[in-house]
Amino acid sequence: MSFKNYIWDEQFDLNVSRNKVRGAVQYHKFGATPSQSINTTASVWDKPNTLYPWSAFNTAGVLVAGIANASDNGKIVRIEGLDNDWNLIQEDFTLSSSGTVTGTVAFKRVFRGYLISGDTNVGQISFTKGGTEVLRITAGTGQTLMAIYSVPAGYTGYLYHGVASAQTGADATGFMYVRFNSIGTTFRVGHTFEVSGSQMYNYKFAFPQPIPEKSDIDVRLTTRSNNGRFTAAFDILLVDEEL
């Protein structure tokens, strides 16, 4: 007997992950900044000391892929994001050592990229939109490390859990910025925390925090006395509001 798409009260979280809860999808977002300088504010993603360039997606458009090492020629990277109507989409790019590769799918948002063929990337892989770098896969990782996300159309995201860590000796103030419903250009703080190399920040929300469709999430850190490598991650449950 198949139980797919039926709601189970017992072990709800496990059954969401098993795709057995109708209209519910879990998403684990995780990011890292390789080395953030002292007294800087930056998004937690693969490009250190920079805020994520959301303005690059004021309009939807195609991505351009480029590699830094010829050994990555022929490998395939899958990009996940949203189209102009904020629906989930993806596109596969076959990397080339002879030049950049231009995609055919128009993205309104991107939030993950990863290799689906070949060995882990030898060199850095970059994706640009309109000349602005919007995705980076650091050498040897095979996957973007981005603590950012955008909630698709028709879904409400429920934030369950957030964590952050700092390299030994480093410390920072963290902010989860949210742009609700993508209204205007204003991000505001939805959650804040402190993190240091002596202890991981680990917070489970007593009640899952709702984030409406077409909202952007951007985890940022402001470093203080010491620089270093920082990580951040969060777990979000997407619920289809049309069911």
Where are the language model's segments positioned?
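Beta-strand-centric surfaces of beta-sandwich/beta-rich domains
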Residues: S2-R109, I116-L243
